[in-house]
Each structure stands twice: as C-alpha cells, then as structure tokens.
Design a protein with these regions (language model features):
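Positively charged n-region of N-terminal signal peptides that target proteins for export
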Residues: 1-4
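Bacterial N-terminal signal peptides
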Residues: 7-16
Length: 344
C-alpha cells in the first residue's frame, strides 16, 4: 500500500546535520535564574506572548513569560510535584499548566495573560506526567498513565474538571497529546516492543487505539499542523534518530497515518516541534555530537534539513509559536538553566 507520508518525511541521508541556517534565527538568551531538573513546556498566550513552565530542583513548578524580546522572572507556584509540567492554550486566551502532584493528584493552574490562579488539585492516581491539550474553546483534556499501565484522563470545561476516568491499554511511556485544531485531541504513547499507539478524543469519546508500529524510545511528541485536523507525532528511534508520523485528518483509521519516516541525525532526546504557520512546522533538537541546538523546518513540501543554530543543551527543547511566523524554543542548558532562541 502506498504510504501517504512518502513525500512528507522521508529524507535523503545527505541532509544530515547542516551548519547552514535555513532562515534567520536570533541569538540564544537567558530566561533568568530558574533551574530545571526536567523538560520545559511552553504555550502561546497571545501574539508575541508565551509562557513556559519547568520543574525546579525543589519539586515545584516555576513559570515565566516571554514578550517576544525579553523574559520576565521565574516565579514559583505553590505545591510540590513529582513530574514535569504540561502547558497548553485553552483556545480562549488562557494557558493551562498541570503536573502530577507528589500525592499522585493532578495539580493545575490557569494563566489569564496577567496572573496565575492559585494551584488546585484534581483527585486522581497518576503514574506519569500529564499531557494536556486544548479540546474545544475554553476546554482542556489532560491525560496520564494510571496505576494499571493504562490511561487516566479528565476534562476541564472552563469552570470545573470531570471525574477522572480510565482507558484500558498498555502504556510504556507517558502519553503526548495535542489538539488537532479540528474539534479533537490526538494522543500517542509507546507500548510493548516500542510500537506506537494513537487515539483520538472527539465528540466526548475516545475513538479507539490504532497501532502505528515502529520501534521507538524516549518519549513521544505530537503537535498539530493547524490545518484540516493534521497532526504529526515524533519519536526518537532506538538508534537516536528522530522519526515522524503524520495523520492527515479525516476518519480515524490507520490508513490516514503515513507511517514513520526518518529525519536523519542523532540526538540526545526527541525533537520538540510546533506549527508557526498553518501547515508548516519547526522542530528543534539537541545533537549527540556537540549538544548544540539544531532546527529543521517543514516548508509545506519538504524539510530544510537540520541546521545548527548554536547553544549547548540537553534533553528535548520546547517550542511555541509567537503568532508572527516565528517561534521561541527553550532548552535546558548543561548548567540546568533555561536558554531560548527565536526563529526562523
């Protein structure tokens, strides 16, 4: 069967890691004195306004704002957490950030563009960090592993959270969820033998797990292309390469996925990707060879190839759109401080 993704992600080996920039990136700047022990998470509030959250060395969530040029100061939210945060727009000008509390409950706070709500708890028994995504306007779905290795999920309707429900599966990794910007949320996870499972939440229900096969390691990363329900899920392969699998929207069926395609290069962790313009993507990753930040841009018909932007970091970067055709990407530097760069 012809794979839908052949023209989208299968790259010639010669692309590799390029030293030439695909477009204009700025210089790396410090985000301030906040130190992180995990992976950051960022989300757009408004044009040229992004918030990011990290888990500090004191097991608290710290948050900061970027105005398109400069960062504010890292602020600690109340409460102790055992996981990295997950942040998402709620589709109505707010950003929701949530993490697993040290009690296993879901700890969350909402940012309205100026202030954060007092962190509160949702009764749950979570066994991984959550992944939260905008469902419909003002609504956010959060999903995490549960005690039996399946998934636990809860929906915020703009005022209250639903009771946590469970979804049977075998999740080896925590899930990665994203809005499809078409009335649904798509989540992927790794299951036995490194295969990828994906499920879509739409019309108030899950549509069923699809086995996308593959042999993945690390953690998945899914992002909307902000176009006709298209979503791409990225994975780090067992040989440290990054692979992508695109869902082309429409009916929830395995035939609507293109299959994993290699993006070349070798990286410390999975790529962090976001859509900066409808139908286009920016991905960032830190290379095994020099720990530098590399970027790869999907321009609508082909990838630019990995271009060395600079810096020195570890783990997966987090990228968020600025609403200007550019993105801000943050990564944990080798000294555990967070640095950022804007492009392309």
């Amino acid at each position: 069967m012809t794979r839908l993704l052949m023209s989208f992600l299968l790259l010639p080996a010669c692309l590799g890691l390029s030293n030439s920039a695909w477009a204009v990136w700025g210089k790396f700047i410090s985000t301030g004195a906040g130190t992180s022990i995990g992976t950051p998470s960022c989300a757009q509030v408004a044009t040229s306004h992004v918030v990011c959250a990290i888990r500090s060395g004191k097991y608290a969530i710290m948050v900061n704002e970027f105005n398109g040029t400069t960062w504010g100061s890292w602020t600690t939210l109340a409460g102790a957490v055992s996981s990295d945060p997950s942040c998402t727009s709620d589709g109505s000008g707010n950003v929701m950030c949530a993490a697993t509390d040290i009690t296993g409950k879901l700890r969350w706070s909402l940012f309205n563009g100026a202030t954060w709500t007092t962190p509160a708890l949702v009764t749950a028994a979570l066994y991984s960090e959550p992944s939260c995504a905008n469902y419909t306007v003002g609504q956010v779905l959060c999903v995490a592993r549960n005690a039996t290795g399946g998934l636990a999920y809860t929906l915020y309707n703009g005022a209250t959270w639903s009771a946590v429900k469970n979804l049977a599966t075998i999740a080896i990794s925590h899930p990665s969820c994203t809005t499809d910007n078409n009335g649904g949320v798509i989540c992927s996870l790794y299951t036995k033998a490194g295969a990828t499972l994906a499920n879509r939440y739409a019309n108030g229900a899950w549509e069923g797990f699809l086995n996308l096969t593959g042999i993945a390691g690390g953690e998945p990363d899914c992002t909307s292309m902000n176009q006709n329900g298209n979503v791409v899920c990225f994975a780090k392969g067992y040989a440290s390469g990054v692979y992508g699998n695109r869902f082309f929207g429409g009916a929830w069926a395995a035939t609507r996925w293109g299959g994993y395609g290699a993006m070349s290069g070798t990286f410390n962790d999975n790529a962090g990707c976001t859509s900066h313009t409808a139908g286009l993507l920016v991905c960032g990753a830190t290379a095994v060879t020099d720990n530098a930040f590399y970027a790869n841009v999907w321009g609508g018909s082909s990838w630019s190839g990995w271009s060395k932007i600079g810096g020195s970091g570890t783990g997966s970067p987090a990228c968020a759109p600025l609403g200007t055709g550019k993105v801000v990407c943050v990564m944990k530097a080798l000294n555990n401080l967070i640095t950022s760069v804007v492009g392309p």
